[in-house]
Regions:
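Amphipathic alpha-helical scaffolds
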Residues: 1-3
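A cross-kingdom feature that marks ATP-driven nucleic-acid transaction machinery
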Residues: 15-16, 20, 24-189
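A short, conserved structural fragment
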Residues: 5-17
């Protein structure tokens, strides 16, 4: 694995604030390779025999799930861009994701975006790449899990979405002073 990391094909990822060890995961770093191994490789014989159009429905069906991690990376990159432009209301020296045990729920939990300044959590975020508007449940879940990544009550909670937000989500965000809804359209301006 380390050899593949040296040539930039794989990336070792740890939860932000992690000390290394058993929680680290390995990911294919290049999205072109991820796409190939997820969609093209399993259908290669079909495609090589001129039946590529028969592979399209399976690719279209799997694309939203494939795009989830891609969108998370886009959101983290956007935060770095905003940080460089001086547009953030909080300091940030690193940004990543967090995963681990949720002792309240007795299950595994993940937070897509965690920004830190040294050892202080300065932002938590959730990223949703879906075709329908993002619902209030996603913001509630983020708010409930924020403490797992060291966030306090005033730590910003940002919900990133490819699509719009439901009215219930917008209303909840208005009543949660630390919340911000970031649409994909805003990120690509």
């Amino acid at each position: 694995l380390k050899g593949l990391a040296r040539i930039d094909l794989l990336q070792r990822v740890e939860p932000i604030g992690g000390k290394g060890g058993r929680k680290a995961l390995w990911h294919i770093k290049d999205n072109l390779f991820r796409f190939w191994y997820r969609f093209i490789g399993p259908r290669r014989a079909m495609i090589e025999r001129g039946m590529g159009d028969m592979a399209v429905p399976a690719i279209e069906q799997g694309l939203p799930l494939f795009m989830g991690p891609v969108f998370e990376t886009m959101c983290r990159d956007w935060l770095w861009r905003e940080c460089a432009a001086g547009s953030l209301d909080f300091p940030m020296t690193d940004v990543g994701c967090w995963w681990g045990n949720d002792p309240k729920e007795r299950s595994q939990a993940e937070i897509d975006i965690v920004a830190v300044d040294g050892s202080t959590t300065t932002l938590v975020g959730e990223c949703k790449w879906r075709g329908e508007p993002t619902d209030v449940d996603q913001l509630r879940k983020l708010d409930a899990r924020a403490w797992l990544a060291g966030a306090g009550a005033q730590t910003p909670r940002w919900l990133f979405s490819k699509s719009a937000y439901t009215d219930a989500c917008k209303a909840f965000a208005l009543n949660l002073p630390s919340a911000r809804l970031v649409a994909f359209e805003e990120m690509v301006r």
